[in-house]
Swiss-Prot record:
Region of interest (G1), ranges: 19-26
Binding site residues for Mg(2+): T26
Keyword Cell cycle: no
Keyword Magnesium part of the UniProt annotation: yes
Region of interest: G4: 137-140
Organism of derivation: Deinonema sp
Protein name per the record: Elongation factor Tu
GO MF annotation terms: GTP binding; GTPase activity; translation elongation factor activity
EC number: 3.6.5.3
Length: 405
């Protein structure tokens, strides 16, 4: 049941915690909700165990456990995701189930960067998480100031290695557990009353100032995946679909892109729920009437887009999660030359997989980067999500990490 109405007064930003298992991501998430709730009674405080038993959700046919919490700072409203298991992170980031405008990388000061720290940073780079803020957790367990400096240096170097601005991004040191315990003892702990709670505020300040407010979907260039096509006698051809981003107006020029040669046309009408409109915007399900376009010139799987804003491509590097047998995926490995269907937006296109040097095969449950060559072009850009299917069954999920040709 909805808990009150959503007040859209502050800009909305999506964030999440990433980092190695047991470094304190979930404890930090709990501490943030308690910290924000101390000054804003509308925020729901969530204890560790409430976040940890995250509900299952499905994205692109894949089951993922994700906890969603929300909180406000004086300037913004945040949606924050936290995943219980490493596999959930991989799946979440690749499917884009929880799009992040920025991430909080949690590193235990007692252990320094660990294998999943590296993996999550690489994933963030591959799937296009644009900003990272670091929270060095458990500093109360480290007595040696030099050791803390060493860990900070290591984390910064690791981030730079994966093309994040490691030297410049904010690193906040604190203890999520100490802050949470202080807030559980006194839920009204305000800023300036406890040094550990203040570190959480410092983190929130860094997230507020370092992660920019994302561009709204309506401000981006127009794109609409075509779901269906039909003819209106005497008026012409209508393409229907949900506008993914931007705005389209009557008399706009648009390109029809993908699957065949790009064609330019003019929008002569827009309708929604059988009513005529002047424009359609991100989120609207519309029918777009196209001038001089025959019924056979446009098909499901193409996109309508602002001319020059997106190009058709066939070859790309993909970051992929392959479903395990238990998740309904393949029961056996696949090899180079594997030819499944790649489901982009509204249609399947066959493609051939080329594995990286030194990789013989890919097992169910693997997270891997490989090159795909499609038999037909698709309107494509970095960050585009897709499913991998065999005979209509999802066997993997991926994201375009790099467009090649």
């Amino acid at each position: 049941m909805a808990k009150g109405t959503f007040e859209r007064t502050k800009p909305h930003v999506n964030v999440g915690t990433i980092g190695h298992v047991d470094h304190g991501k979930t404890t930090l998430t709990a501490a943030i909700t308690f910290t924000a709730a101390a000054s804003d009674p509308t925020i729901e405080k969530l204890a560790y165990d409430q976040i940890d038993k995250a509900p299952e959700e499905k994205a692109r046919g894949i089951t993922i456990n994700t906890a969603h919490v929300e909180y406000n700072t004086p300037t913004r409203h945040y949606s924050h995701v936290d995943c219980p298991g490493h596999a959930d992170y991989v799946k979440n980031m690749i499917t884009g189930a929880a799009q992040m405008d920025g991430a909080i990388l949690v590193v235990s000061s007692a252990d320094g960067p660990m294998p999943q720290t590296r993996e999550h940073i690489l994933l963030a780079r591959q799937v296009g998480v644009p900003y990272i803020v670091v929270f060095m957790n458990k500093v109360d367990m480290v007595d040696d100031e030099e050791l803390l400096e060493l860990v900070e240096m290591e984390v910064r170097e690791l981030l730079s290695k994966y093309e994040f601005p490691g030297d410049d991004l904010p690193v906040i040191k604190g203890s999520a557990l100490q802050a949470l315990e202080a807030l559980q003892a006194n839920p009204k702990t305000a800023r300036g009353e406890d040094k550990w709670v203040d570190r959480i505020w410092e983190l929130l300040d860094a997230v507020d100032s370092y992660i920019p407010t994302p561009e709204r979907a309506t401000d981006k260039t127009f794109l609409m995946p075509v779901e269906d096509v039909f003819t209106i006698t005497g008026r012409g051809t209508v393409a229907t679909g949900r506008v993914e981003r931007g705005v389209v107006k009557v008399q706009d020029e648009v390109e029809i892109i993908g699957l065949r040669d790009t064609k330019k046309t003019t929008v002569t009408g827009i309708e929604m729920h059988r009513k005529l409109l002047d424009s359609g915007m991100a989120g609207d399900n519309v029918g777009v009437l196209l001038r001089g376009v025959a019924r056979d010139d446009v098909e499901r799987g193409q996109v309508l887009a602002k001319p020059g804003s997106i190009k058709p491509h066939t070859k790309f590097e993909a970051s992929v999660y392959v479903l395990s047998k238990d998740e309904g995926g393949r029961h056996s490995a696949f090899f180079g030359g594997y030819r499944p269907q790649f489901y982009f937006r509204t249609t399947d296109v066959t493609g051939v997989v080329e594995l990286p040097e030194g990789v013989e095969m890919v097992m169910p449950g693997d997270n891997i980067t490989f090159v795909v060559e499609l038999i037909k072009p698709i309107a494509m850009e970095e960050g585009l999500r897709f499913a991998i299917r065999e005979g209509g069954r999802t066997v993997g999920a991926g994201v375009v990490a790099k467009v090649l040709e």
